[in-house]
Amino acid sequence: MANDQHTELETEFTLDQVKDQLIEQGKKRSSLNYKDIMEKLSPFDQDPEQMDEFYEHLGDLGIEVVNENDEEVSNLRQGEDHDGNDNDDFNFDDDLSLPPGIKINDPVRMYLKEIGRVPLLSADDEVELAKRIMNGDEEAKRRLAEANLRLVVSIAKRYVGRGMLFLDLIQEGNMGLIKAVEKFDHNKGFKFSTYATWWIRQAITRAIADQARTIRIPVHMVETINKLIRVSRQLLQELGREPTPEEIAAEMELSVEKVREIMKIAQEPVSLETPIGEEDDSHLGDFIEDQEALTPADAAAYELLKEQLEDVLDTLTEREENVLRLRFGLDDGRTRTLEEVGKVFGVTRERIRQIEAKALRKLRHPSRSKRLKDFLE
């Protein structure tokens, strides 16, 4: 079973160190690629508001954040006609394809077809809607959100198979999209898709961390696990075999110990009711040793000891027998103090001590003790 006490791994660099590296890189080139920023900062549990502050800081330093290779939007625009009109026959199987083996049911298919009919926006349209939103135009909010629903789907499909239904991933991503619509500031010079992507990814990864696993894993650790999985798959293709922890560590630039710990955290809990065997007539729990259970031999010896002890106690007076039963918890496993036993019999604790001492002397007599000695060896 997975341990619910996870030690949060320290990254090779702190968040501030990574940001300093990005700033240094941006100063040399006067710009930074949005994709590079996302990749470097994704292992950290950054709120979108914190990302906004970082982007503003980059702008103050004269570093432009570019999004020249915006794959999300360029792929989505393939669903439109060249004249800019929306295509009623939007091919969601091509644009929003899922990993092999993942099927979509009718509600999802209907949803994808519906959002495929919503025309995408030009950069000028986005700016115009953003201005209206800043003036409190609710219709502009709705229009900007609807035009980017396909962006949510294209991001959500990357997280299929991680413990949440595809439709649930889309729903969580849509919540992030709504947040992005409310907070988007066109004056910063970002395309809306650039800004919204972080909010959408953040909403989905947080939902997976909170809901997908029996044992919750911190968001930043979910990102680290995802990166390890990607590296493992890449090495599997290159090497033609499963990579070793040492090979993964070298590729991720982490220590082997950290990679092993990440792999341990990534393990899913297994139910004790998991069927085992071809007939499914056994369960995993049947094959796990109960460390507290007695062996058959010990159980038999324990039953014999109980029988002999009952016979020996029968040779005492009723009061002596009951005092010993209460003092040593022979019936219910709970021992009582002299004072507690005294209250039961309505006598002083000193009187109970005397009765107990007398009863124990009787039990030590060879005529009685020899019947129990064999069980003490």
From Swiss-Prot:
CDD domains: Sigma70_r4. Keywords: Cytoplasm, DNA-binding, Sigma factor, Transcription, Transcription regulation. Its main location: cytoplasm. InterPro entries: RNA_pol_sigma-70_dom, RNA_pol_sigma70, RNA_pol_sigma70_r1_2, RNA_pol_sigma70_r2, RNA_pol_sigma70_r3, RNA_pol_sigma70_r4, RNA_pol_sigma_70_r1_1, RNA_pol_sigma_70_r1_1_sf. It comes from the Bacteria. GO terms for molecular function: DNA binding; sigma factor activity. GO terms for biological process: DNA-templated transcription initiation. Residues 223-299 are annotated as: Sigma-70 factor domain-3. Residues 72-92 are annotated as: Disordered. Residues 144-214 are annotated as: Sigma-70 factor domain-2. One of its GO terms (cellular component) is cytoplasm. Residues 312-365 are annotated as: Sigma-70 factor domain-4. It holds the Pfam family Sigma70_r4. A motif (Interaction with polymerase core subunit RpoC) lies at residues 168-171. It is found in: Cytoplasm. Residues 338-357 bind DNA. Sigma factors are initiation factors that promote the attachment of RNA polymerase to specific initiation sites and are then released. This sigma factor is the primary sigma factor during exponential growth. Interacts transiently with the RNA polymerase catalytic core. Belongs to the sigma-70 factor family. RpoD/SigA subfamily. This is RNA polymerase sigma factor SigA.
